[in-house]
């Protein structure tokens, strides 16, 4: 009966975390910019029939703040309760429109062409989308910039996305109703030149994502090289959107059914990264915008966790560990060939870490509950064990959920901000789970 919200649940760590929650019995709402692709991925799981009825997928572009507000408003009216929020979605390396182009046909096709079992996962979203689009009418071409109207200059999907971005009447919820189309809006000069050769059709990686052959990406940029667009997008996705979701949905997390006591084991997990840690001794001079965004996320947790704990909501920042090599493809390939290099953890390890705060709480509660509910805690306790094992592989990073006086947050994020505060906590007897 627990209800969870997971942002960025389409691929990689988010997808694996979604599966863990569903298989543990949760009702799950997943957000992604590409809802039909996400629904199809979940539907292909062999045990989909066991939990598919508890999954809903919504399209949402977290770069579009008014749409994030609208989505939270929708959940406030739709859900009777909300137990867990996992702010997993992030932007580390910005991808141009061509990276996502191979999904656009499926995302924009007529809904009746989508298999029924996938349509069911999208039912609430498509209903909301249709309702919000009723007053809309296709914008006349005259609303597009004249320099873009030349035949052949923009693909149809891009032209449609440009109309969405420019149209004043529909822009307020474009990130909710047209989340996939917005990925096709060219925002940088080089994105207007055509880069299809860098994203060869049909070449996907192990996560079924488009292969990116660019010689340089965001991970290699110095401060003076970061475009304003990327700086703003990174802040919006990694820090602003989690702030809004946590703030706007707090009343929903506190909502209780008539005649029942408020639950004090609700959780918010803000998915962080080593880039956001101040105490780390070795830090490169690259990708400062990503470091800034994750540091801001950690400070939100550090500041607000005590306030939320007073209402029984445990807020933690959790580092997934080193899961992905973000270097450009040719550099990553060279490292494998010359040094047999692979990141020490995988997406399952990362997912185990971010569900760990939830799993530990339910495991403890299960010891005091009837046998009928013990299975939920035991199942997620396995994830906690995997998490503990993975932590031993990456010494020096944020490890485990540190049990502090504010429900797991206090010492946790103090460790990210500075070790001195953590040591004082330990002197008071607050034990860190290593």
Indicate where each model-derived feature is located.
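Conserved Rossmann-fold cofactor-binding substructure of NAD(P)-dependent oxidoreductases
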Residues: 62-78
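A glycine-rich helix->loop->beta "capping" turn
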Residues: 52-55, 74-87
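Conserved Rossmann-fold SDR core element
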Residues: 54, 81, 305-320, 365-370
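A conserved structural motif in NAD(P)-dependent oxidoreductases
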Residues: 338-352, 365
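Canonical Rossmann dinucleotide-binding motif of NAD(H)/NADP(H)-dependent dehydrogenases/reductases
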Residues: 1-32
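Catalytic loop of short-chain dehydrogenase/reductase
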Residues: 90-235, 240, 247-310, 320-340
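Core catalytic loop region at the nicotinamide-binding pocket of NAD(P)H-dependent oxidoreductases
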Residues: 352-377
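Rossmann-fold cofactor-recognition segment
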Residues: 46-66, 160, 164, 219, ...
């Amino acid at each position: 009966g627990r209800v969870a919200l997971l942002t960025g649940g389409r691929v990689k760590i988010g997808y694996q975390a979604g599966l863990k929650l569903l298989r543990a019995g949760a009702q799950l709402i997943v957000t992604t910019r590409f809802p039909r692709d996400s629904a199809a991925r979940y539907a292909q799981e062999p045990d989909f029939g066991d939990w598919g009825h508890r999954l809903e997928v919504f399209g949402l572009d977290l770069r579009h703040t008014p749409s994030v507000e609208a989505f939270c408003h929708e959940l406030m009216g739709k859900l009777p309760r909300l137990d867990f929020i996992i702010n997993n979605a992030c932007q580390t390396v910005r991808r141009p429109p061509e990276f996502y182009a191979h999904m656009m046909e499926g995302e924009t096709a007529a809904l009746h062409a989508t298999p029924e079992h996938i349509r069911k996962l999208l039912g609430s979203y498509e209903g909301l989308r249709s309702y919000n689009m009723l007053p809309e009418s296709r914008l006349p071409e005259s609303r597009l910039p004249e320099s873009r109207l030349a035949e052949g200059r923009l693909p149809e999907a891009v032209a449609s996305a440009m109309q969405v971005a420019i149209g004043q009447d529909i822009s307020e919820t474009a990130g909710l109703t047209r989340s996939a189309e917005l990925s096709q809006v060219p925002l940088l000069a080089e994105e207007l030149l055509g880069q299809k050769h860098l994203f060869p059709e049909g070449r996907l990686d192990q996560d079924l994502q488009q292969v990116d052959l660019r010689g340089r990406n965001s991970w290699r940029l110095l401060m003076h090289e970061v475009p304003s667009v990327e700086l703003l997008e990174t802040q919006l996705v990694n820090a602003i959107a989690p702030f809004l979701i946590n703030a706007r949905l707090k009343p929903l997390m506190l909502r209780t059914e008539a005649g029942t006591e408020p639950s004090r084991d609700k959780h918010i997990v803000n998915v962080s990264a080593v880039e956001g840690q101040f105490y780390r001794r070795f830090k490169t001079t690259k990708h400062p915008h990503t470091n800034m965004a994750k540091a801001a996320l950690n400070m939100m947790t550090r500041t607000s966790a005590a306030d939320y704990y007073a209402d029984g909501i445990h807020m933690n920042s959790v580092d997934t560990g080193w899961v992905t090599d973000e270097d450009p493809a040719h550099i990553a390939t060279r490292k494998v060939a010359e040094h047999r290099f692979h990141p020490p953890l995988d997406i399952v390890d990362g997912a185990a870490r971010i569900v760990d705060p939830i799993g530990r709480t339910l495991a403890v509660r299960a010891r005091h509950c009837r046998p009928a509910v013990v299975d939920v805690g035991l199942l997620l306790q396995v994830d906690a064990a995997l998490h503990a094992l993975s932590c031993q592989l990456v010494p020096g990073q944020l490890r485990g959920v540190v049990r502090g006086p504010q429900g797991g947050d206090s010492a946790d994020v103090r460790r990210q901000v500075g070790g001195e505060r953590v040591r004082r906590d330990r002197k008071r007897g607050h034990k860190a789970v290593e």
